[in-house]
Amino acid sequence: MAEKFTEIRILDNFYQTSSFYPMPVVLVSTMNENGSTNLGPYSLCFPFVVTGGEKHSMLLIARASSNTALNITRTKVCSLNFIPDKKKYMKNCVQLGFPGETSEQKMKNSIFTLQPSTRSGSPTNGLTKFPDIVEEAIQVMECTWDDSQPLPPTPTSAESSYFVLVIDKIIMKQKWKDSLFKGKGFPRIPIDFGFRDNIQFWFSKHSKPYPIKVPGSKASSVETVLYACTRFDPDIKWEKEACAKIVKVPNVFLKRVIGGVVKAAKKEGITIITPEFMDKVQDKRSSEKN
């Protein structure tokens, strides 16, 4: 007999008090008023704008009175440092995240190594430099707060600030850049289950990621895709083998994909879509592999 569901009362911080919700662990580096770097660990940090333009961004939720929130509000810049899953790093994150301490008090206990930002150009808002980044990180997103977004930095209904952070630059260690390009291998990144029992934070390791292919039954026929492609723009011709490259694209996204390929072809002065051109378009990193 199947086990029944039972209701849980929804409390503040429901993601850790009323549910099990896996989260990332991100060290956010910001600039203090004296020019030093502050590190604050956060887990409520998620992709926000993911497609449709150049302003790809992350959403960060932080306590409004925290060093991190105050620094971002003042300087508008920060860096998101994704650190590897090591127990000593998690212990230090718990120390760095303890509320009520000044940045100077917290940073005395930091075991992380800071190095200069990799951003080019001059910082604004009276800064002499950008926030440092964490040398031990697997990858870093260097960001600028988009304060034009309709998210108030300090909602009246909560003690939190919501920051839409436009990603100016992503850097990562060469090993993981190679893995990203090859589509093989993943870094061991910690999983946070939050503060529970009013005593301790809970973290988890993850096992090796595994792939699951899209079912072949979901694919469209080549003839169906060819028909859609030829109708899209009469000035652009498609080889049948090129259409075969996108038969597994869900129908709801097919028009968008075809439009993207046609746009890329016209940009390069191409009038016939070949399988080779499709491979180039589908490889979003082709320009970085030369």
Show the residue positions of the predicted features.
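Active-site-proximal mixed secondary-structure blocks
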Residues: 1-41, 46-226
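Non-catalytic accessory segments flanking P-loop/AAA+ NTPase cores
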Residues: 222-290
